[in-house]
Design a protein with these regions (language model features):
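A short His-aromatic
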Residues: 1-2
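Conserved strand-to-helix beginnings and helix N-cap segments that scaffold or border functional pockets
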Residues: 5-6, 35
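A short glycine-rich, Lys/Arg-flanked "PGG" loop and its adjoining helix->strand segment in the class I
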Residues: 6-21
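Conserved class I S-adenosyl-L-methionine
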Residues: 21-45
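Conserved catalytic-core motifs of GNAT/GCN5-like acyltransferases
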Residues: 48
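Short alpha-helix
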Residues: 51-67, 73
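Conserved Class I S-adenosyl-L-methionine
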Residues: 66-139
Length: 139
C-alpha cells in the first residue's frame, strides 16, 4: 500500500536506532512473470488501494539499498477462504463473482502454484498465497 516501497524502507532504515531491528511481514509475488502478474492482478482487483506484491528478490534489494542486512528470513504460505477474504475488503457481489471466474479460469500452472480449491458446487473455496518475514538490521 506504499506508493514508493524503496523510499519507505529507506525511511525505516534512517530512523532505526543503531541496534534496532526492522521486522517486515508481507505477501510476496513469485519471481515467475505469469505468477507475479496473477498475484498482483488478483490483489488489485480485490483491493484497489493495493500497490504491488513484491518478490522476495525485490524485498532483499530494498533492504540492501537502504543499508539494511537481512538477519533472518522465513518464507511461508497462507491459505485464504475465498468468501472470508472478499468480505474483508467489502468486494461487491458482482466483482466477487467476476474475480472468482478469473481465478478459476487461470492456467494449470497458476492453479497448482496457488493450490486453488473448489467446493462441491464448483465455486471457489480457497487459495494459498506466499508471504515473507524479514528481520533487518543496520549494516
Amino acid at each position: 500500500h506504499f506508493p514508493n516501497i524503496a523510499r519507505a524502507v529507506r525511511e525505516v532504515a534512517r530512523v532505526l536506532k543503531p541496534v534496532g531491528l526492522f521486522l517486515l511481514v508481507d505477501n510476496i509475488a513469485l519471481s515467475d512473470p505469469e505468477l507475479d502478474d496473477f498475484d498482483n492482478r488478483v490483489e488489485k482487483w480485490r483491493d484497489p488501494s493495493h500497490g504491488r506484491s513484491c518478490t522476495r528478490e525485490e524485498w532483499h534489494a530494498f533492504f540492501t539499498q537502504a543499508g539494511l542486512v537481512v538477519a533472518y528470513e522465513e518464507n511461508f504460505r497462507k491459505t485464504h477462504n475465498y468468501d472470508d477474504w472478499t468480505v474483508r475488503s467489502q468486494l461487491p457481489a458482482e466483482e466477487k463473482a467476476a474475480l472468482e471466474h478469473f481465478i478459476l479460469a487461470s492456467s494449470d500452472k497458476i492453479q497448482h502454484s496457488y493450490d486453488i480449491k473448489t467446493r462441491s458446487d464448483g465455486h471457489l473455496e480457497s487459495f494459498t498465497s506466499n508471504a515473507i518475514l524479514l528481520k533487518g538490521r543496520k549494516g
